[in-house]
Amino acid sequence: MYLTNFQRSLKLLGQLCSSPRDLIPYFRYSITNNSPLELELPWWSQSAIREIQKHLNHSHNVFEWGSGGSSVFLAKRCKELTTIEHHPDWFEQVERILKDKETSNSRLLLREINLEDEQAFLSSPYAQSLQSAYDIIVIDGEDHFGPESSWSARESCFYLAQEWISKDGGLIIVDDSWRYPALREKTKSKKMVIHESIGPCRKGVTSTDFHYY
């Protein structure tokens, strides 16, 4: 749901009042000029970041659509990470950071994407990159989303992810989940948790959903 600036401000105030521990991170992120990539943090809600820090360990194989600070963050904490990116310039930036951090357990792959329509997207190398089972799948990449859109690339990725996620404790993470209410109704997960809070380098409140299988 799209909010007015006034509604966003009220929601932010309510969130900070209900979760005082987010006050310090919020103001720290507000005064920094660093990006999530430079901070080595996912661009998720703060609540989701806290939760994945408790959940993730070095036995997990992770797949990620969309690269950035999350790629560095996850690579440091998992067994193996495969990340799919479609934007060449951004790919080079993230690749450079991953090499600097010596994350030898990560694979960053550049894959073409086609957003002409949903079928073209599903047939693109970007969508077809997921071809094996993973413990954790993160959906935080490119999208075809907006008030006039009839389909969403991230929703399509979610349905693909449900085919490949481990059914023995697997986890699918959907960022900016407020955009995709249909996924909360169509999930096949055993449990779903909505993490709504502030996030790194965000001016307002966002949500990141965890689907447990």
Locations of regions flagged by a protein language model:
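Generic enzyme active-site microenvironment
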Residues: 62, 83, 138, 173-174
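SAM cofactor-binding core of SAM-dependent methyltransferases
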Residues: 46-117
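C-terminal substrate-binding/active-site "lid" region of AdoMet-derived donor-dependent transferases
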Residues: 136, 142-213
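Short, well-ordered alpha-helix to beta-strand connector turns
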Residues: 59, 78, 134, 189-190
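Surface-exposed interaction regions that form or flank ligand-binding interfaces
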Residues: 112-128
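Glycine-rich phosphate-binding "P-loop"
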Residues: 26-42, 53-56, 136-137, 141-150
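A short acidic, Gly/Pro-enriched loop at the edge of an enzyme's catalytic core
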Residues: 127-136
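Membrane-proximal basic amphipathic "stem/tether" segments
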Residues: 1-43
